[in-house]
Amino acid sequence: MKRIALCVLICLLALVIAQPAQTQAGFMPAVMQDTKLDDLKREAAGEVDKLQTFTQQMVDQVFSFSELGFHEYETTKYLTGALEKQGFKVERSVAGMPTAWMATYGSGKPVIAFITDIDCIPRASQKPGVAYHDPIVADAPGHGEGHNSGMAVNITAAVVLKRLMEKNKIGGTIKILPGVAEELVGAKAFFIRAGLFKDVDIVLGCHVDSDFAVNWGQPERNSGLVSVQYSFHGKAAHAAGAPWSGRSALDAVELMNAGWNYRREHLRLQQRSHYVISDGGDQPNVVPSEATVWYYFRELDYPHIKELYELGNKMAQAATMMTDTT
């Protein structure tokens, strides 16, 4: 029921936004009476209710694909096919990404965009309806963050909005875009760079919440982030025969991580930062000449994100000085 309520909410937000739009000849006047808007809200709720099976099928189907970022091929094929059947025009491989797409309907202002994520996370395979860890395939990826549900909600809301626009001759444009590789901080930045939001008046998105709760308008619960890979370069040597001849890039990685962890106590409570060592060398008896650590720096706004990023850069530079690496 909460998923259906969210579909209604998103659709109604779009209707309210569309209300003051300048319209074409023969379309509804720019300012609708409150009673007319109330009628549209009730009609939207009824249409969403009729699409419960359609919505649930999308949720389950995307869950079954469970594709990692930039590899959402089956998910993309399924979702774009569903949108084309509903009368949307689909442009594929947008912004230079094979699994990215943009579906559109209508013309003119306002331009309302729907966006939500579609990728999954590693090692999160899980049988549906089971309240304990029980993977479908051991160590396989899965939708551990609920990205199988958001696009179903957005598409349902967009389909209902399209039907009401057609029936009531409401002008405007609907856009639907997928959050490709959101877990890797992927598509949205590339969409912006490609200019896909230049004509957009507002973007509406949704994401499943903890315990299937529904909330909105709480920016303090959400953060932006910068993804950074720090690659250190040292000098290889035999770790037993002549370690003094080497300069360990892995030592630099470990010192950077140690420095960052000591600094955590003195960072804002709102920040989140995490890392993995994505390259720690080849084998223990060789001093690693190359090593890489991958960081995410999260904060509530850009200035604070930038502060974390610049602090990370200082930690990396200090690590190179201590280890005579670059």
Which ranges hold each PLM region?
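Bacterial N-terminal signal peptides
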Residues: 7-16
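Histidine/acidic-residue-rich, glycine-tolerant segments that coordinate divalent metal ions
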Residues: 133-142, 148-149, 165-288, 298
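Signal peptide processing junction and immediate N-terminal pro/mature segment
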Residues: 19-27
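Positively charged n-region of N-terminal signal peptides that target proteins for export
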Residues: 1-4
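A common structural junction motif
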Residues: 118-121, 263-264, 313-323
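A conserved active-site cap/scaffold subdomain adjacent to cofactor or substrate pockets
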Residues: 286-312
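Acidic/His- and Gly-rich active-site-bordering loop/insert found
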Residues: 26-143, 152-172
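Structural recognition of the beta-strand scaffold that forms the well-ordered cores
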Residues: 61, 91, 111-115, 175-178, ...
